[in-house]
Amino acid sequence: MIQGTQIGQHIDKHGDGIKDVSFSVDNAEKAWEETTSRGAESISKPMLIEDDKGEAIIATIKTYGDTTHTFVQRNNFNGNFLPGFEDIKLKNSANGAGLVHIDHVVGNQPDGVMQPVCDFYEKVFGWHRFWSVDDKDVSTKYSALRSIVMANDNEQIKMPINEPAKGLRKSQ
């Protein structure tokens, strides 16, 4: 990891984890305006980035802890990722793994923080509670957790928000 970079600082502070969860959107400016008008803190206003493969618009908001969400609009872009990124040819790629979709991304929280984070997704994104479990549902002698799965309207995006529950060891 390159020292002094945003992701390098995040990993130094938190260990392995995710700094930013990006969402593909039809209109990044509208997504940013809507979420910030509902109380999200802006990290970066919508900005145009471009190269010879086209253009994209990105905007970022703060969520829980040091985690952010970036809205990515790639309507006029023909590259594999975003303008300015170059394809890397891997010698030993995982060809044929068959992965086509991410089912969910988990946001683990400290004890007592799960509900305020879920309230944030409901208020800022208009999401709803898809499913929830408590320590009676997910526990062993040594560990337990509570979880609320938040989802968007069509339930294509799901984000379980977890927090630890009492056990002989902490697991989350």
Model-derived features: positions:
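Glyoxalase I/VOC metalloenzyme domain signal
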Residues: M1-K45, D52-W131, S139-Q172
